[in-house]
């Protein structure tokens, strides 16, 4: 251990206490999600499974960052998806939304004006809306076809302000839905390899799908996983 760090005494202990408390709060938030998971999946999964277009994900701020990751995971695991920033959606980008699509709208408060407005627009177009919210009685939840409750007892940082535990639960919910869709569609390693030929994962999936690495995979950058 660095001697200067060890000599900090009280500051060192406060840092470690905050770190452990944050982790415990994140784990507790996932425990709450686990308790209500079956009902959540049974509500949203049929909407996603019936989608014949693309799964469009939207959000703003930290919810938007998480939404981008959810969309990327869906696309790489057999569910075509893309992300639209809610503000851009209200300035023309909603034109990318078509009949047959599903909109996943993420807002922890469920009151973010632009996200709600995009949700309302999608609903008027006949596009099913899945609301991912921390408040199930919010405006966004009320307009939705299905609601995913990602509420947490508190955020993981000391002030209980910065999106931390709530964004973790939201991202995990996206992973859960992607995994459920993979299982329903019998998505295979070969399917994954087709969508992800690059990086270490490309090499790994080539081995799983064909029994041996493909030379084409080695010619693509291995920086990404």
Question: Model regions: which residues?
Answer:
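Aromatic-residue hotspot detector
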Residues: 41-45, 83, 192
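Internal, active-site/partner-interface "lid" segment
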Residues: 142, 156, 183-220
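Short, low-complexity, intrinsically disordered N-terminal peptides in bacterial proteins
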Residues: 1-17, 209-225
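Alpha-helix boundary/capping and short turn/kink residues
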Residues: 35-38, 60, 186
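Generic N-terminal leader/processing signal
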Residues: 24, 60, 218-221
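An N-terminal, well-structured beta->alpha segment
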Residues: 4-50
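Glycine-rich phosphate-binding loops that contact phosphosugars or nucleotide phosphates
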Residues: 49, 53-182
